[in-house]
A protein has these predicted regions:
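Terminal catalytic/cofactor-binding subdomain
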Residues: 1-151, 155-156, 189-201, 206, ...
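Helical (often loop-to-helix) elements that flank the catalytic cores of nucleotide-handling enzymes
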Residues: 173-196
Length: 525
């Protein structure tokens, strides 16, 4: 078993999250969520861009969502679409903290900026809740052309609507293109199946439409239908094969993980990202997990989610060995712990597994599903009710309410009943400023300081006007405009260490562009 990474410096494992929020309008329950999601994004855009008449456009040219890691491409066209960033269902925004905020299907989605540690990722992820909450407040304060008030919006960090629909809480991990994708599948499938014991958000109802009464660990489990798939909205797989790195495609792939739940718990989010990163480190270093393959992984996903004792055994592919989800996680921990150079992920991982092995209900201060279960079980006992009681479904949704004044998770935090890992000050700063450890620093910093000069952008590009004309006219066809095309293919470049002095002291965006030109980031047209 290889172990070189345990004794040498590992390159940063860049992380990112994508949360599709549940959305409702209590005063108008029949209104289209596509419309309300658009209203939320545009309200936030109006504030960030100071009411500019010409919105910053999302640059779709680098995107390839139908390219598959198994070597084929399902793209139906090869020209990027021309999309109005204000259109209903298509509202799209680059945020000054380096994130993307847009409408995805019928949900407002926050895609966090790239971060270099799991803790940074938790901070950036939590900043998304505050941005969403601000967007909802701004939408409610807005008025339409006739002077009618905007909608009251409620936003939830969950994955199911109770009517059969599921929406995503996706994770992203950059890894080397030299790594065989089959090794990724083999190494991560048993891990993803069993990590539910600490990543689950908890759910009332069994089956996709909750057709059976009961409680289960994961909100996402019933929607996993196959082992490997490119799809994210149907026939969902344990492993998603999308090959869209948003980086140098000759060097990197991006592992797009769709099996996870939307967590409120910072411990769960930290472990979800940190442990997965360590397993990828080990896979890239040659560690094998062939002996941990499950006989029926999809069935095991459902079985683990419904085992509230965390003790039910899963049959491995050798037809002889049986392991519980917690036992499987202990084995993963043993094989990858030497890759955790800081030791913080492994320490918390072991603590949580020890509690789950003793008595899962003792993990209520750490994990969403246990906290939610204990709240519901207490109410169920007082009412003498079954799991189909409507008040339990109400707790399910209220737990995930991102409004600190109303959400049950936030009430537990205020009471000291949930462990947190980051400070409110860190999260507040992450709303305004991009992480300093990745290219997000330049993307967000240019938006923060020179947003009026930005014409378009994406994860890997920015188009800015260095003449000063665009900030006055908001018309890219105006005479005298001089466009600079900034390429940000290298995720670990253009950090605060590399660009901070110039970016923060520059008086014009042209000065920043000149600095980036010396770093090879400006593409000449």
């Amino acid at each position: 078993m290889a172990n070189s990474a345990a004794n040498s410096a590992q390159p940063n494992r860049f992380f990112g999250t994508e949360i599709e929020y549940g959305i409702s309008s209590p005063d108008n329950p029949d209104v289209s969520p596509i419309l309300t999601s658009t209203q939320a994004v545009l309200a936030f855009a109006h504030e960030q861009e100071e009411g500019l008449s010409g919105r910053i456009r999302w640059d779709y040219a680098p995107e390839s969502p139908l390219r598959d890691s198994r070597g084929f491409d399902l793209r139906r066209y090869h020209q990027p679409p021309i999309v109005d960033p204000n259109a209903v269902g298509a509202a799209n925004l680059l945020v000054q903290n380096g994130a993307r905020f847009y409408v995805d299907h019928a949900h407002p989605e926050y895609s966090s900026p790239e971060t270099a540690t799991a803790r940074e990722a938790v901070i950036a992820d939590r900043a998304g809740d505050k941005i969403m909450l601000r967007a909802a407040q701004l939408a409610a304060e807005a008025t339409d052309a006739e002077g009618n008030p905007g909608p009251v919006l409620k936003l939830y960090r969950n994955n199911v609507d109770g009517k059969g629909a599921s929406y995503g809480a996706h994770e992203n991990y950059l890894f080397s293109r030299e790594t065989e994708f089959d090794d990724i599948v083999a190494g991560l499938t048993p891990f993803f199946v069993t990590r539910q014991v600490f990543t689950g958000a908890g759910r009332v109802g069994l089956g996709q439409i909750g057709q059976e009464s009961g409680f289960q660990i994961s909100q996402r489990a019933d929607y996993i239908e196959t082992e490997v798939s490119l799809e994210t909205t149907l026939n969902r797989g344990i492993i998603n094969t999308r090959d869209e790195p948003h980086a140098d495609s000759n060097r990197f792939r991006r592992l797009h993980v769709i099996i996870g739940d939307a967590n409120m718990s910072e411990v769960a989010t930290f472990l979800k990202l940190g442990t997965t990163g360590l397993v990828i480190d080990a896979i890239e270093d040659g560690v094998r997990f062939d002996d941990l393959q499950l006989r029926n992984p999809v069935e095991a996903v459902h079985k683990v989610s419904r085992d509230l004792t965390c003790t039910e055994k899963l049959q491995l592919a050798d037809h002889v060995t049986w392991m519980s989800a917690v036992e499987m996680q202990y084995e993963y921990l043993r094989r990858v712990e030497s890759y955790d150079q800081q030791g913080d992920v492994v320490k918390l991982w072991r603590e949580v597994l020890d509690v789950l092995a003793d008595d899962p209900r003792k993990a209520a201060h750490l994990l969403d599903w246990v906290a939610k279960y204990n709240l519901m079980e207490g109410l169920r006992t007082r009412l003498g009710a079954g799991w189909d009681h409507p008040k339990l479904a109400l707790i399910d949704i209220q737990y995930s309410d991102i409004d600190p004044a109303r959400g049950l998770y936030h009430a537990l935090v205020r009471r000291g009943s949930m462990r947190t890992l980051v400070t409110e000050e860190e999260v507040d700063r992450a709303v305004e400023y991009a992480p300093e450890s990745s290219r997000a620093y330049v993307r967000g910093g240019i938006l923060r300081r020179f947003g009026k000069d930005v014409v378009a952008g994406s994860w890997t590009s920015l188009v800015v006007d260095t003449s000063g004309v665009y900030r006055r006219t908001r018309d890219v066809e105006s005479p005298g405009i001089t466009l600079a095309y900034i390429t940000l293919d290298e995720v670990d470049r253009f950090t605060a260490a590399e660009c901070g002095d110039v970016l923060e002291s520059a008086e014009t965006v042209a000065e920043v562009v000149e600095h980036l030109r010396t770093l090879g980031a400006v593409r000449e047209q």
